[in-house]
């Protein structure tokens, strides 16, 4: 299983104060020196709430690890990424909403202009991945547009697991739709969410599409996904950076890697 480390929230901390620290390149080399991280993931948002264009340029210039850039189909961002001398190893196209706290679901594959953006990256020799819900229609769209990789949105699975097996439902930001569900209901829905991820990962494999996954994964809920042999990559960020606040980034990375690289 490949481990993609999302370092957006290193930059979130920097941007809150509009200062120079923490330094994103230090995070990059801490990750590299663990010898456990396979790629670095960053999200270049339209609103630039964390990662900035300059961060992209600096990372691509010196990174010893592959860089996966998440982004919307925004024309300015597409033009910027297509113009780069140093190319990312892949671009993952994601949905985006300025009012969201984080990505709320998979990409709508009927989105106008999506096909053109895929072709624009392909013409520049950049691999494209689509961040999608684990649905067959999304896989058929990827196949039709010669996209060889998808990343399944694991938010539904992760939220259900957290509601059932952690104190998430008692926290200030508990998900209201899950608070009133019984443990039996949560367990059944969690099981179905896992089965859907497993089914679509297997479907992707038989279609010649590499299946990755990410969103909301943490040290507790990631373990079950290791039972899906056709999943090839997990992208994890917030949970690792959160733990790093208390134990340091190196240890936080190593603890996650120990779980997903058994």
Task: Show where each model-derived region lies.
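Conserved N-terminal beta1-alpha1 strand-loop-helix module at the mouth
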Residues: 1-68, 74-86, 144, 165-171
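Hydrophobic faces of well-ordered beta-strands that scaffold small-molecule active sites
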Residues: 3-7, 40-42, 67-69, 89-93, ...
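Active-site mouth loops of central-metabolism enzymes
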Residues: 3-25, 66-73, 100-108, 122-134, ...
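Alpha-helix-loop-beta-strand connector modules within alpha/beta enzyme cores
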Residues: 33, 49-75, 109-129, 174-212, ...
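Catalytic cores of alpha/beta
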Residues: 74-87, 135-146, 211-213, 217-231
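Glycine-rich phosphate-binding active-site loops on the catalytic face of alpha/beta enzymes
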Residues: 91-100, 149-162, 230-249
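Histidine/lysine/aspartate-rich catalytic loop segments that bind and position anionic ligands
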Residues: 133-193, 200-203
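C-terminal helical cap(s) of enzyme catalytic domains, especially alpha/beta-barrels
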Residues: 162-178, 242-262
């Amino acid at each position: 299983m490949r481990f993609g480390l999302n370092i957006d929230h290193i930059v979130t901390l920097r941007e809150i104060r509009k200062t120079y620290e923490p330094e994103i390149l230090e995070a990059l080399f801490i990750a590299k020196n663990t010898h456990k991280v396979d790629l670095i993931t960053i999200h270049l948002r339209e609103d630039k709430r964390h990662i900035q264009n300059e961060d992209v340029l600096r990372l691509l210039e010196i990174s010893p690890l592959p860089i996966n850039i998440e982004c919307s189909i925004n024309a300015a961002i597409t033009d910027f990424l297509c113009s780069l001398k140093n190319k990312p190893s892949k671009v993952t196209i994601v949905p985006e909403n300025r009012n969201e706290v984080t990505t709320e679901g998979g990409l709508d594959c009927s989105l106008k202009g999506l096909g053109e953006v895929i072709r624009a990256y392909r013409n520049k020799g950049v691999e494209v991945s689509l961040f999608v819900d684990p649905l067959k229609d999304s896989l058929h769209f990827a196949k039709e547009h010669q996209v060889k990789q998808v990343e399944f949105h694991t938010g539904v699975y992760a939220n259900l697991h957290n509601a059932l097996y952690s104190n998430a439902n008692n926290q200030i930001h508990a998900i209201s739709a899950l608070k009133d569900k019984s443990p039996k209901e949560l367990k059944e829905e969690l099981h179905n969410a896992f089965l859907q991820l497993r089914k679509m990962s297997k479907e992707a494999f038989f279609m010649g599409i590499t299946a990755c996954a990410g969103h909301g994964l943490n040290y507790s809920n990631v373990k079950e996904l290791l039972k899906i042999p056709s999943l090839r990559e997990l992208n994890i960020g917030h949970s690792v950076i959160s733990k790093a606040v208390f134990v340091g980034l190196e240890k936080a990375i190593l603890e996650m890697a120990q779980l997903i690289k058994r």
